[in-house]
Amino acid sequence: MGLLLPLALCILVLCCGAMSPPQLALNPSALLSRGCNDSDVLAVAGFALRDINKDRKDGYVLRLNRVNDAQEYRRGGLGSLFYLTLDVLETDCHVLRKKAWQDCGMRIFFESVYGQCKAIFYMNNPSRVLYLAAYNCTLRPVSKKKIYMTCPDCPSSIPTDSSNHQVLEAATESLAKYNNENTSKQYSLFKVTRASSQWVVGPSYFVEYLIKESPCTKSQASSCSLQSSDSVPVGLCKGSLTRTHWEKFVSVTCDFFESQAPATGSENSAVNQKPTNLPKVEESQQKNTPPTDSPSKAGPRGSVQYLPDLDDKNSQEKGPQEAFPVHLDLTTNPQGETLDISFLFLEPMEEKLVVLPFPKEKARTAECPGPAQNASPLVLPP
């Protein structure tokens, strides 16, 4: 009996140790450098950018120009975390349009807005799970100085705030033209989103602006002010106003947003290079996505900041390393932090994933950065 008691105590200690949660013993060196033109990396980058655009409520849809850096943290049966640095371009689609970034047009060079996004993206192929854990983006307009050296007569961007009466006039005049030509609904100005000016046969102003439905029709003009107005933007208009000594020229086109219904599969396609198993992952993830009010997904997962162009006086003091400051600090613990991802799975289970800090240094491999869709130095981050 004297020998049985120590033996029982040893067995109890071993069992308790087996049931204890494993200690974090991780190192950022666990990150695997990936080729920026690998088909699966491009597909994951496409999914990440799709979700970045879906998460935003303001601004224009961002388009992938190239993968600048890609690192993967493989977690065995739990899938992989991708740490992506993406060079992006702003398109002509507003995010409220809910259009896939692949289907949005690229802006002409003198209107370009470009930048960089960092994203942490989780993929579990066997369980068919895709999830954007966090992102941050920094954007700048193309340098006015460089545009002027290339095209001195091209339109130049101007502030969109309400203090610029020429911009406000161009928006209200062009919207009035649209309302006059529209036989039923009337619309009012919600917000000017872009503006530029140019001298043609006189001063010309070009504007893009969000519109909302007016609570009345033309026949109700006298009682319109007595009715409440819906403040939700319903479309994006592009207008222009040119004045000469004798007359003015006004033009306008409007593109209306679709209803806020769930996006269809056509809006969620991956990038052109599609591994055969990834579309199945996306299809199932659409069906198994939890409600948007899930506590685990509440709140924004990132942000997009706009800075002046690099030749602006406010940017002169910053060196190349600070040109596009994009910080993604989901965790600063070098050993990583656990992230509860149970809500991503259809089956009731408890799943936790260790997330490492976003790497401060790029992998610097021969395969990165990848080839750019637009290789102009004007729109590539330094």
UniProtKB/Swiss-Prot annotation:
Residues of the signal peptide: 1-15
Expression sites (tissue/organ) = Liver and testis.
Compositionally biased tracts (Basic and acidic residues): 310-320
Renumbered to this chain, the Polar residues biased-composition regions fall at 262-276, 286-295
- One MF term from GO for this chain? cysteine-type endopeptidase inhibitor activity
A Pfam family that this protein carries is Cystatin
Q: Can you supply one Gene Ontology CC term for this chain's record?
A: extracellular region
**Where is the protein localized?**
Secreted
- Domain annotation Cystatin fetuin-B-type: ranges: 25-138, 149-255
Please list the GO biological process terms of this entry.
binding of sperm to zona pellucida; negative regulation of endopeptidase activity; single fertilization
Kindly list the positions at which Phosphoserine occurs in this protein: 315
Q: Which residues are glycosylated?
A: 37, 136, 182, 289, 292
Q: Does the keyword tRNA-binding apply?
A: no
Disordered as annotated region, ranges: 262-320, 363-382
Q: Which family does it belong to?
A: Belongs to the fetuin family.
**What's this protein's function?**
Protease inhibitor required for egg fertilization. Required to prevent premature zona pellucida hardening before fertilization, probably by inhibiting the protease activity of ASTL, a protease that mediates the cleavage of ZP2 and triggers zona pellucida hardening.
This protein is called what? Fetuin-B
Protein source organism: Homo sapiens (Human)
Q: Which gene encodes it?
A: FETUB
